[in-house]
Amino acid sequence: MDYKTAGVDVTAGRAFVERIKSCVEKTHKSEVIGGLGGFGGCIRIPKGFESPVLVSGTDGVGTKLELAQQYGCHFGVGIDLVAMCVNDVITNGARPLFFLDYIASGTLTPDALAEVIEGIAAGCCQSDCSLLGGETAEMPGFYPIGRYDLAGFCVGIVENHHLIDGTKINCGDQIIGIKSNGVHSNGFSLVRKVLSMANVDENTLFGKDKRNLIQSLLEPTAIYVQLVEKLLRENLPIHGMTHITGGGLPENLPRIFPSGLSPHIDITTWEITEIFNWLQNAGDIPEIDLWNTFNMGIGFCLIVPKNEVNSALEICIKNDFEAWNIGQVVESQNNSKNIGIFGIPS
């Protein structure tokens, strides 16, 4: 009996690291010290910072992985993994510095996992972020053969006096909603339940590019790093930012609000992405559950002074992101931060 007989092929693991090395090292910026394969990844703090603050975030892709593995779509979930982490980190005004990944599988499937790493590297390139290292764990008997799970970890950096934490949000500020790519990486337990029901036509087409149902559902999460960087470079006074993930707008938007203030949005100000209408109709999902589960077409929000709305929208549009003024900041009752939503049928 040996380790390979028990289900762990160490030689294949080493070969896999060599296979992905060039892909990973293409993401490395000048601050990276050394290459792939050490015990720890090393990186210098970029020059020019006087009082840097490090901002960290960690996340996974959830049960979207089940659907992706079912249909052999591995590259996109690599992008999803990066997006879920970097989009959180940038809400504090930080720019992503480095990313780490963790992949666990029942048995090493080099082709599928190489696609995942290629997707992670692509997401890091979109985020101007170095893929500093990672871990690939082969765990026979723990995960089914052919199945894998992902986790990611990102660290960003921002000057202390440029940190955005919501404390500057004022009554009367406006809420800019930036379009999502679709479902992103949340709510897939409900999505998969809908797909398991009878009479689901996977050939239903969505959007201008006429993608089928599965392609639309597996569209990678939008990465907002470059857009936020350009907004900040224009010295736009952003009082708060939120990444709309699990729990949708009702759960995520109020998280950064100071006591005594709450968001009020008007859902008639943007067109709900058609994939959500399909999910509601196919699964007979109550309206309130839809809003409390999915992003409903808004993947990221900015909170800005009223007189900066046009500037914010212009920068978004100039950088190929659809965006709308979807609401405003109001005084709340009893210091509640609960969101007010106009337009949901009772």
Swiss-Prot record:
Keywords: ATP-binding, Cytoplasm, Ligase, Nucleotide-binding, Purine biosynthesis. InterPro entries: PurM-like_C_dom, PurM-like_C_sf, PurM-like_N, PurM-like_N_sf, PurM_cligase. It holds the Pfam family AIRS_C. It catalyses: 2-formamido-N(1)-(5-O-phospho-beta-D-ribosyl)acetamidine + ATP = 5-amino-1-(5-phospho-beta-D-ribosyl)imidazole + ADP + phosphate + H(+). It comes from the Bacteria. Its main location: cytoplasm. This is Phosphoribosylformylglycinamidine cyclo-ligase. It comes from Prochlorococcus marinus (strain NATL2A).
